[in-house]
Each structure stands twice: as C-alpha cells, then as structure tokens.
Amino acid sequence: MTPAPVIIAVDGRSGAGKTTLAVELAARLRQHHKVSLFHLEDIYPGWNGLMPGIERYVGTVLKPLSTGQAAEWTSWDWEKHYDGGLNVTLPAEIVIVEGVGAAADAARPMLDAVVWVESPGDDRRRRALTRDGSTYEPYWDSWAAQEDEWLSTDEVIDAADIRVQNLADGSAPDDVLQALMYLPSVAAILSPELSARRGLQLRSERLAETPDAALLFDSLYGKSTNAVWLDSSNASAVAGRSQAAARSRFSILADDGGTFGQSALHRSGMTHVTAGSATVSTSGPFFRWLDSVWGRRAVRAPRGYDGQFTLGWLGYLGYELKRETGGNDVPSDTPDAALLFAGRAVVLDHREQTVWLLALDAPDAEEWFREARAAVKAATAPDSAALDAAVPGRPGTVPEFTSRDSATDYKRKIADSQHEISEGNSYEICLTTTLEASAGDLDPWASYLSLRRRNPAPFASYLRFGELVVASTSPERFLRILSDGGMRAEPIKGTRGRSSDASEDAALRHDLETSLKDRAENIMIVDLLRNDLSHFAIPGSVTVSRLCAIESYATVHQMVSTIDAHLRPGAPRAEALAAAFPAGSMTGAPKISTMDILDQLESGPRGIYSGAIGYFSLNAATDLAVVIRTLVVNPDGTGGRTLSLGVGGAITADSVADDEYEEIRTKAFGVLSTLGAAFPS
C-alpha cells in the first residue's frame, strides 16, 4: 500500500469538456508527479446508469484509491450493453477522477479538490455528439434528465473548489492548474509548480514621455472588466523633493490581462480568485490569504527605476475586514476586498517625466510592450478626437442624495458618542454616515475625470471591478511599507474648508494650525498608530517625524502627522498590515472598543469607505491610502446602480455638534459639488 494520494475530481455535465481537461491537466502534472487518471464513463452501467455508476465508482474505485490501495473495478461494454472485464487503477502521487458524478456527495469526503466544468448547453450537446456521434444522440435527453435529477439533490456545484468556464481557446488546463495552487489541500504537493511560477523575470522599458494619463488609461484599459489607476492627480502642483511631492511622484495603471492576470474578491471569510477561465474559492481570513500571495515572488527592480511597485496586486480593502482585526462581524453591501494581479503595468514617474512599462516575462509580453508603447506615444500628443473620446463631457444627470442620518440624528449620535467618552469607554470616536443616491445615467469615468480636475490629490484612484466602480480623491496615506522594511503612516485629523479670498483662506489655515481641539484629535491618533506600528517594528524604531503639520488641497486644509518605523526582519507583512487596520484616523481610540461603539451608533456598514486602496508589490512593498472623499458606484442587484459617499469626523469630549455637522458637509463638498449635487437637508 502506498501513501494516500491527492485526489482531484473533475466534474460537470455531459459535454462540458471534462475528459479533455482532465487528460491535459494530467499531462501537465506528470512533468513533476506520478498521476493516475480514471474516467467514470468506463464504469456507468449503460445509458440509464448514472446513479448506479456513481455508486460503483465510490465503492470500488475511490475508496481503495483514497487509502493508497489499487482499485479493482468492472468496466462497462458500451457496444454489448453489459459488464466487461476486470480493470485495475493503481494509486499514484496524484489521482484525477473525471466524469459526471466524480464529486458526488458520497465521494466528496475522499476528495482533496473539486473542479466543476461549465459550458453552455448548446456547446455541450455539440461537443458530446461530435465525440460520440450517433451512438449518443438517442440518449442525450434521457441522460440529461438523470443529471437534472442528481443535481436537484446534490449541492456539488456549490461545493466545488474551482469553477471553470471551458472555453474553446484551450486555456482551461493552465487556468485550472494555476487555480489549484491556491488550495491549501493541494498546495504542498504542487510545490514544484509553485517554484516554477516564483522564478519570475521582470522586463521593463523606460520612455522619456509625458502622456495624458486619462487618455492613456482609457486607451489601454477602457474596455477591461477589471482595471486600476492609482492616480497622483496633484503631481503638477507639488513638484520638487518635499514629502508632498514624494507622495505624488508615481501613478500606476494596470488591469488583470495577460498570462499572469488574476482577480480576487473576498466576502465574509471566502476568497474567490479568478485566473482566466477558472475561479477558485478558499475559506479563511483575508489577511491569511494575503500573506500567502504577497511578496512571495521576489523580482529585481529595473536599473534606474525608483518606484516601489514591481507588479503585483492592486485594489481595495473594505472597512468590514475589521472582523479579522478585533472588530465585530458586520456584512457589507460590497466585497470586503477586491484586488487584481497585474503581470504588466504602466508607471508614470511625474518627477522625472518618464514612463516605465513593466511586464513579467511571458509569451504575450512582447506584444503588450508594442501596444503599450504605441498607446503612450498616442497619449503624449493626442489629437482632439482622441481626447474627446477619452474625456467625455457631463457625468450624467445630477444625483439626489439622501443621508442615512438626518442632521438631528447625527447630532444625537454625537451626544451619544460624548456620553461613551464621559463613561471612559473611548477617548475619540470617528463617527460617520453615508450619503446615498440612485446612479441613474451617471457615467463613473466622466465623474472621476471631473473629480480629479477639481480635487487633485496624491492618492486619487479609479478602480473598476466589473460593475463596481470606485472613484477616490483621497489625500491621506494609511500605511506604506518599503521593500526594505521602512514603514510610514500619515494620518489626517483636522479639516477646514478653503476660501477663494486669500486673506480669509489664510485665516482658516491659521485657525486649524492653532486649534487645540484639532491638535488633540490628531495627537490621539498619532499615539494609536505608534502603538499599531510597534507590534511588528524593531524596538526603538518608531518615531514621529512630523506632528500636526498643515497641508492645503483644492477644497480643504488638513492637519497631518507622520509616524515612521522599521519592520522587524522576517516579520509577516500581512500581519503587520492587519495590526494597523482599519486606519486609526477612521476609528478613534482605543481602536477595538471604539469600533464596538461605532457598530452600535452607525446606521449601516461602511463598505469600501474607511478602508484602504493601493498595491501589494511582488517585492513585498505596499502603499495604501485611506478611503475618504470617495464615490462608490455599486450594482443594486436589480439592474440599477447606487451611489454612496461616506463622510465623518472625530468626536471628542469638547466637540460642538453644530461644528461637527458642518465639518462633514465641508468634507462632502468636493465630491458633491463636482457632480452638481447638494448635501441632503
């Protein structure tokens, strides 16, 4: 008897392409492993034998193989319509079982991975009849009826670890193999395949061009289902080598296309990763999944490239991931995290006025370089028609927002917050609410372009994950971790609106700069973040390099501090991130007890608002912004779309309710005024 094998079931309806997929998957796995392959069609007892065949398969094939023993089974003679000879399937390091019912309920306890193969009904019928000819045609309907009956009682589709759309392009075997590597149950045995994927080579080109970023993004990724633009839209306003200029030096444009492209969505403990035609689902905490994929494929940065992003994951983390960092479990209307893996990207270096094209070496890399090079050239000297196409006019009908909390309700919650503070349950509570509207005919792309023009910011971003769109003009860095372990947080606490009158604007800035209340709020969050970073920092490395500085943006003045630290060598970076998440500037202090209070006070989940947007690079670097000043466009499940804009402010013992309410109106103004909308009365 040999050790128990890893058993992979390839299931799906007749004609879905299971046999071809299983054979080609086995061929790929045989490069590093001994593989046995079993086809259920060899054991079904006739055209009416689906359920008896599954029973035979489980009892005579799967049970012995699962314990490392040879399986002796009786085949079916399809021409003579009775049992054929005795056959033996030997155990191996990996066993693939394929056919309708391969992952049936009785089989699943003995399986390590379940792959469900999907294909449209017409394609399945054509494929099956092409394979089996006139022999199968009279039985197609009766066999399909047996499948229907089985699937009506067996939740095999929902139980699948991987679901694959078996396309005609032949991509399914490679996509499934890549998806299998995400499954803890088979990842260990696939270490040779994982090692091969980790030996990645980064190719690059440097172009001395200054393209129009919006036109370039639209040209390369305007039709991509998933795409991300991390947009330092205020770069022209902060030239030089100051901290503000450093934050605004790079913009990153990417999608999940190409050989290495993937996307990941996380909801309430389940992570779904799509690689081409295959989607793999794994249960467990998001930050544990992130730890398994972030910084595991070190690549060397190109010579002369100063950026920290060397390809990797980009997207957002939602506020409700706090369930993994000490907060309560609150369901969100949007995925708790959405990321794409960019195996190729365009990086704009605004300081050096250059463009970097980055791509992992792959068969399709050269073609992408040609396309990207041409797009950069076209966006550097665009004609008027190209600009008109990429930069549309009106965003759409002006939306009418409502608020989850009326002015009276919000002010009452301010009083409730101050009661919690007086009871000693918190020092500072970052109370928020959400403005909501029907999206109507609003164009998210046009809206974002208007937002970035009117409210340029170092951490602006445009994210598209299918129908979900995020348009952010955030000025606030949550957390940066450099590839060498340097950490930095830059919380914002304290806001004043700008004035068009220079003297009045200067007075507003001075008022913020000298406000004892705002300084107290800011210093409390600085202290919280010092603690958050210290959990994984080298002792003594946590410093405050800037305290309560004032930065001015298009519509607001902000009070900003900077906390620096250095990550302990070997410390898990995803855990260091989790220790600081969500941003203390969006919770208050102390963090965990204050999050509990906020769950009681606030009228619904925050969703993407208060979370983080940014990247997780292959070289283990990350740079994340706090999700504020951000418009979210989300499908409502009925064919429509909703808009949401989160706003809030820090409540302390000496907060004045009217002033706090005016502050959230000020924070909302930049986004609402761009849309032509008003703050709800």
Over which residues does each language-model region extend?
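Conserved nucleotide-sensing/catalytic segment adjacent to the nucleotide-binding pocket
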Residues: S36, Y44-L90, I94-V95
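Extreme N-terminal, non-catalytic leader segments
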Residues: M1-I8
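P-loop (Walker A) phosphate-binding loop of NTP-binding proteins
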Residues: R13
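Extended alpha-helical targeting/anchoring segments
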Residues: S185-S681
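ATP-dependent NMP and nucleoside kinases share a basic, alpha-helical "lid"
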Residues: G85-D132
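Hydrophobic positions on the alpha1 helix immediately C-terminal to the Walker A/P-loop
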Residues: L21
